[in-house]
Regions:
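Short basic/aromatic active-site micro-motif
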Residues: 18-22, 93-97, 113-133
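C-terminal catalytic core of tyrosine-transesterase DNA break-rejoin enzymes
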Residues: 24, 28, 34-35, 105, ...
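C-terminal catalytic core of Y-nucleophile DNA break-rejoin enzymes
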Residues: 59-78, 84-105
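Conserved tyrosine-mediated DNA breakage-rejoining catalytic core shared by Y-recombinases
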Residues: 1-7, 38-78
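Catalytic-site neighborhood detector that most strongly recognizes the C-terminal catalytic loop/helix
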Residues: 58-62, 96, 144-169
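Basic, Lys/Arg- and aromatic-enriched nucleic-acid-binding interface segment
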Residues: 1-33, 133
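Acidic, low-complexity interaction regions
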Residues: 94-97, 105, 110, 182-187
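C-terminal secondary-structure termini that scaffold catalytic or DNA-interacting sites
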Residues: 83, 170-187
């Protein structure tokens, strides 16, 4: 998958590695660029059961979001922990426009034939990471900071559209490979 390619591809330049890491972090947290850029270590909380959480306010809506952190975002945080040039920030972020420029290079390096934008990370979290893996829509809505579940349902429609497209492509590929005898069936 494209997400696997992003995670596993070796980046030849430090700036591209940092960009890729921040983008992958967003793919696994669903945060918008401005929200990732504002994170500090104070946003990371470990509860009494040992679960690591990311707690922040969405800049766009002021909604509080609590996101249980999977292993990949935790590893990315550890990778950049203590870097002096972060000036107290959690991750090495750039402006949104500069990030999108670097993401074009990251996509080429990973063999992804589309223009990556930072907002695609949020979309990837909603579709590829959560909804496609059975996370309930209500939980996804809460983690994305959606006030209205209808906003989250847009992502679910994208998944249904993609499923239909994939099955239609499959039907085209296997057309004629299988047949069923219908002469004895009364209609």
């Amino acid at each position: 998958s494209e997400l696997t390619a992003l995670i596993q591809t070796d980046m030849i330049f430090d700036r591209l590695e940092k960009m890729r890491d921040v983008f992958v972090f967003a793919c696994f947290t669903g945060l918008a660029h401005c929200d990732v850029a504002g994170l500090t270590k104070e946003n990371i909380i470990t509860d009494e059961a040992g679960q690591v959480w990311l707690k922040t306010h969405r800049q766009k809506t002021s909604e509080v979001v609590d996101i249980p952190l999977l292993e990949i975002p935790q590893l990315i945080i550890k990778k950049y922990q203590g870097m002096k040039e972060l000036n107290g920030k959690l991750l090495p972020t750039l402006t949104n426009s500069c990030s999108n420029l670097y993401l074009k290079e990251v996509a080429v390096r990973c063999g992804i034939n589309k223009t990556l934008t930072f907002h695609m990370a949020r979309h990837t979290f909603a579709t590829t990471v959560t909804l496609s893996n059975g996370v309930p829509m209500e939980s996804v809505a809460k983690m994305l900071g959606h006030r209205n579940i209808r906003t989250t349902q847009i992502y679910a429609k994208v998944i249904k559209d993609k499923l239909a497209e994939d099955m239609n492509n499959l039907a085209t590929r296997i057309c004629g490979d299988y047949s069923i005898q219908t002469s004895n069936i009364a209609i």
